[in-house]
């Protein structure tokens, strides 16, 4: 189990995040309320505090690679990798990487999708943290974790800026492996 995220007791950070996150109704489809993180990214002090808080539980966990899930996971994962002195690996939609890659498919409500990484992105035994902005159902994160395992990595955990707990993502991934700053 990961230590508690320091910022969860930092009511100022939580309040600042809640003030800056923007709800966009009916995006990308009618009935969905999209959590827009771009106002957080636009504020350098707040963005820095977010990266510090997201990386804090994993300091001392010997993370060697941080996998950022396309696309907003890149924006959080790369600076978290720097903060942890780890390498960064992008997990992309199939067909987007230039070198030989490995794909992991997963089911959606209506159809399927996939995530891919370069076949040499993670070495045997590397300790890997998976990062994304929002945890919803957990399908993409779960597929990314399977891909990490197929490539020989050891999953340290998952880290998200926010979790939509009503969609059951933390239960799917295993709550003890999931760290988030905000829960909705």
Curated annotation (Swiss-Prot):
The keyword rRNA processing does not apply. Pathway: Purine metabolism; AMP biosynthesis via salvage pathway; AMP from adenine: step 1/1. InterPro entries: Ade_phspho_trans (IPR005764), PRibTrfase_dom (IPR000836), PRTase-like (IPR029057), UPRTase/APRTase (IPR050054). The keyword Membrane does not apply. It is found in: Cytoplasm. It catalyses: AMP + diphosphate = 5-phospho-alpha-D-ribose 1-diphosphate + adenine. Keywords: Cytoplasm, Glycosyltransferase, Purine salvage, Transferase. Pfam families: Pribosyltran. Its EC number is 2.4.2.7. One of its GO terms (molecular function) is AMP binding. Its main location: cytoplasm. GO terms for biological process: adenine salvage; AMP salvage; purine ribonucleoside salvage. Coiled coil: none annotated. It comes from the Bacteria. One of its GO terms (cellular component) is cytoplasm. Transmembrane segments: none annotated. It is an enzyme of class 2 (transferase). Belongs to the purine/pyrimidine phosphoribosyltransferase family. Homodimer. Catalyzes a salvage reaction resulting in the formation of AMP, that is energically less costly than de novo synthesis. This is Adenine phosphoribosyltransferase. The gene is apt.
């Amino acid at each position: 189990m990961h230590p508690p995220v320091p910022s969860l007791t930092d009511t100022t950070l939580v309040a600042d995040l809640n003030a800056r996150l923007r709800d966009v109704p009916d995006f990308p489809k009618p009935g969905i309320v999209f959590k827009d993180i771009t106002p957080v990214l636009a504020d350098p002090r707040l963005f820095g505090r977010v990266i510090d808080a997201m990386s804090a539980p994993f300091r001392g966990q010997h993370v060697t690679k941080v996998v950022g899930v396309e696309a907003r996971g890149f924006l959080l994962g790369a600076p978290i990798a720097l903060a942890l002195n780890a390498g960064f690996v992008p997990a992309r939609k199939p067909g987007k990487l230039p070198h030989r890659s490995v794909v992991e498919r997963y089911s959606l409500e209506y159809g399927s999708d996939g995530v891919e990484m370069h076949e040499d992105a993670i070495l045997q035994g590397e300790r890997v943290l998976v990062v994304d902005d929002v945890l919803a159902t957990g399908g993409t994160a779960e597929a990314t974790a399977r891909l990490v395992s197929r490539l020989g990595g050891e999953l340290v955990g998952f880290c998200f800026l926010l979790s939509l707990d009503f969609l059951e993502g933390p239960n799917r991934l295993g709550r003890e492996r999931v760290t988030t700053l905000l829960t909705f």
